[in-house]
Amino acid sequence: MGMYKYIREAWKSPKKSYVGELLKKRMIQWRRDPVVKRIERPTRLDRARSLGYQAKQGYVVVRVRVRRGGRKRPRWKGGRKPSKMGMVKYSPKKSLQWIAEEKAARKFPNLEVLNSYWVGEDGMYKWFEVIMVDPHHPVIKSDPKIAWIAGKAHKGRVFRGLTSAGKRSRGLLNKGKGAEKVRPSIRAHQGKGK
């Protein structure tokens, strides 16, 4: 097996492999770190490479922490019975991974989100690593594999649900029977697709 295959096998079931112990130690530090933190290199090199990361100028990797669980809605100030406050049992329409990508994009407005992947979770948080690209960097513009991201159509792509996590949340990875109401969008079908 090649190096990347060993890494992939270890990350398939982190608790059973050496990755579990590593994650325990790393998360102690991760909890103290800021919500969005730029890192030197990817934690999961195999996953990052398969999602388009290259170790060259113009690529940035960011680790993002997201609170687990349903959406925390703002509490009403006016009077009403507790059951009608609309506080609980409301889940967000976005996945936590998509939310993590948006957090990274807001922190680095000059970069575009390419992709992201899971790196860990505990009882309270989930961590994702987001691969970001500088669309104005000459190295990116001259690379035919990634130069497409510099086009106008991809500006703010994460906020329009054009990343893999966004498309998955919008139901666009489903095809055929049962997916009639997700294209061109859920809004176009009055929200019946979700």
Swiss-Prot record:
Any single GO CC term annotated in Swiss-Prot or TrEMBL for this entry: cytosolic large ribosomal subunit
Keyword field: Ribonucleoprotein, Ribosomal protein
Transmembrane annotation, as ranges: none
Basic residues bias: start-end ranges: 184-194
Superkingdom classification of source: Archaea
InterPro entries for the chain: Rbsml_eL15_core_dom_sf, Ribosomal_eL15, Ribosomal_eL15_arc, Ribosomal_eL15_CS, Ribosomal_uL23/eL15/eS24_sf
GO terms of molecular function: RNA binding; structural constituent of ribosome
Region (Disordered): 168-194
UniProt GO BP: cytoplasmic translation
Keyword Nucleotide-binding belongs to the record: no
PANTHER family (alphabetical): LARGE RIBOSOMAL SUBUNIT PROTEIN EL15 (PTHR11847:SF4), RIBOSOMAL PROTEIN L15 (PTHR11847)
HAMAP family: Ribosomal_eL15
Family to which this protein belongs: Belongs to the eukaryotic ribosomal protein eL15 family.
Protein name as it appears in the record: Large ribosomal subunit protein eL15
Organism: Thermococcus kodakarensis (strain ATCC BAA-918 / JCM 12380 / KOD1) (Pyrococcus kodakaraensis (strain KOD1))
